[in-house]
Amino acid sequence: MRLYLCEKPSQGKDIAAVLGAKTRGDGCLRGPGVVVTWGIGHLLETAPPGAYGDHLKNWSLDTLPILPAQWKVIVKPKTASQFKVVKQLLKEATELVIATDADREGEMIARELIEYCGYRGPIQRLWLSALNEASIRQAFSSVKQGAETYPLYLSALARSRADWLIGMNFSRLFTLLGRQAGYTGVLSVGRVQTPTLRLVVDRDREIANFIPKPFWNLDVQLCTAGHSFLAKWVADESVTDDEGRCLDQSAATAALNALQNSQMATAISVETERARDSAPLPFDLSTLQEVCSAKFGLGVQETLDVAQALYETHKATTYPRTDCGYLPESMLDEVPMVLDAINRTDPTIGKALLLIDPEQRS
């Protein structure tokens, strides 16, 4: 039996539909010779310090640092029933296809189950960038060998264990030091959250301590040989700050008066630069969140929820959490349909759409 292991139920249903696996089972879908099952995100998690000994259940400086010699994982209680399904199917499977999200976290979700359940059969990897039918069929035609993506699992595993080591050890350390100083709460420390908090605090302090200083710019529209251009007055260094801005109003006023009286100016420096702007790539998640926050006031999680729904439910976008900004070639055949939809939505850009080469590849 060939088992397809997906990351979430919605993903499993999309893949099962293409495979013809229509018979609903307990936590899976079955078809001729195939079974599609899924996790609900991670079904396993790294064990807490107490799992390595009763002496680590209580917080004490004497037990730090906690450095597991042999790492342990445990089944997440909330999804234990689905774990049992996956474990049993892995026992029955003669071959396995990992069909989780195409990133290192998706790789880890599958690989940690494979190791925990002791599956030793052949492994292939279905690399999906989108969940529309054409992309799924394209992925089926170019299935990878499991060894090709195994390093992604090692990367995710290193990240996970680094998070654990930093979070568990430093949270205990600073909480215990805080208690010695009279603080009774928990001081949470994290590999990502603590540096991010530092950036926010530093920026907040900069804003609080900022002393506004007025400065004066002088931009002049000049004309020579029938051509006009915008020139910028450069003040003497004695009256400018580190960014070259003039801090002396009288110097700026004097320069303005001199220009108005003479009607002549000399360009002392001319810079010419030839530049080529490439078309922007599709959004990655962080850029999408920045734009949605600035334009629509959406929070980070709200933007992620919308992006996930567009990917999983509506099949309108590609996988939102990928680091790659390029679309899969399997979607090239859909370009004319997408351009037509854009034209019908906003006919004012119809002429611009005619200039697009629908066959172009990056």
Regions found by a protein language model. Give the residues of each.
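Intrinsically disordered, low-complexity regulatory segments
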Residues: 1-168
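A generic secondary-structure signal for well-formed alpha-helical elements
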Residues: 19, 23, 117-121, 144, ...
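Long, highly charged, low-complexity internal segments
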Residues: 35, 43-75, 184-312, 340, ...
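Helical mechanochemical/support elements of P-loop NTPase systems and associated helical scaffolds
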Residues: 11, 15, 78-89, 105-113, ...
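Extended, highly charged linker/hinge segments and catalytic-adjacent loops that couple domains
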Residues: 149-156, 163-169, 175, 313-362
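Short, conserved phosphate-binding/catalytic loop or strand-edge motifs used
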Residues: 129-135, 285-286, 306-317, 321
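Conserved phosphate/pyrophosphate-binding and hydrolysis machinery centered on Walker-type P-loop NTPases
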Residues: 5, 76-79, 99-104, 130, ...
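Glycine-rich loop/turn
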Residues: 1, 163-186
